[in-house]
Amino acid sequence: MADEMETKGEKKYKYSIIIPTYNERLNIAIIVYLIFKHLRDVDFEIIVVDDGSPDGTQEIVKQLQQLYGEDRILLRARAKKLGLGTAYIHGLKHATGDFVVIMDADLSHHPKYLPSFIKKQLETNASIVTGTRYVKGGGVHGWNLMRKLTSRGANVLAQTLLWPGVSDLTGSFRLYKKSALEDVISSCVSKGYVFQMEMIVRATRKGYHIEEVPITFVDRVFGTSKLGGSEIVEYLKGLVYLLLTT
């Protein structure tokens, strides 16, 4: 589907997929396989930004490089955990695509949606296409009621205070025109999970065209969630900061 749309537009675009990792040894090979499966006719590269995982994630990525090629799988490791926001910035420095996709490594963002992201962008010429759990066709699988209420509440609070123009402000599965991402990311100051929220708010304030694609978010299959109390506090601080500065 994505390849057909590219052909109609004549130009063959390249996509850089940035995947930050920390202790994702059990997931990274699966998500890479699924990306190749769903983007068979698309020109893309996968940039893995690993923050010094002690579980052997980097060794698995190196094996994937031997299988798929170092030109398709790029490992850009860092010595320690430096924050999600800086991981995107680090990956962006090495991206050679016309577009940049950011997604999680834990299989909560299924690569089967990537063709829909690409199709939506090509049809609308949007600067940003973001996945949303909160429109018809979207949803969440694997969360308990408390987690769903917390996520929904955080999103409603942000919507009420910030008016971002998108239905899922706290989502982190997005496609950007590279030039738009470079512009937006240069004005962001957050480093952790609130970075995603800041990027979409800054993009809205700058007037970028944003489209949405419904997705079903699936709770991680292997490993444990890295979202805890400190991230919730960080989110609330970030919300106040954005309210005062945007």
Swiss-Prot record:
Residues involved in Mg(2+) binding: 106
Keyword match Membrane: yes
Catalytic activity: a di-trans,poly-cis-dolichyl phosphate + GDP-alpha-D-mannose = a di-trans,poly-cis-dolichyl beta-D-mannosyl phosphate + GDP
Entry keywords, A to Z: Endoplasmic reticulum, Glycosyltransferase, Magnesium, Manganese, Membrane, Metal-binding, Stress response, Transferase
Cofactor(s) listed in the protein's UniProt record: Mg(2+); Mn(2+); Ca(2+)
Keyword hit for Transferase: yes
Biological-process GO terms, alphabetical: dolichol phosphate mannose biosynthetic process; protein O-linked mannosylation; response to ammonium ion
Superkingdom in the source lineage: Eukaryota
Recorded metabolic or biological pathway in which this protein acts: Protein modification; protein glycosylation
UniProt-listed Enzyme Commission number(s): 2.4.1.83
Cofactor descriptive note: Binds 1 divalent metal cation.
Any single GO CC term annotated in Swiss-Prot or TrEMBL for this entry: endoplasmic reticulum
Molecular function via GO: dolichyl-phosphate beta-D-mannosyltransferase activity; metal ion binding
Positions annotated to bind Mn(2+): 106
Summary of the knockout phenotype: Reduced root growth. Slight reduction of chlorophyll content. Wrinkled seed coat. Hypersensitivity to ammonium.
Protein localization: Endoplasmic reticulum membrane
Misc. remarks from the entry: Plants over-expressing DPMS1 show altered stem branch diameter and morphology, perturbation of the vascular bundle arrangements, wrinkled seed coat and constitutive endoplasmic reticulum stress response.
Family: Belongs to the glycosyltransferase 2 family.
Subunit structure, interactors included: Component of the dolichol-phosphate mannose (DPM) synthase complex composed of DPMS1, DPMS2 and DPMS3; in the complex interacts directly with DPMS3.
UniProt protein name: Dolichol-phosphate mannosyltransferase subunit 1
Name of the gene: DPMS1
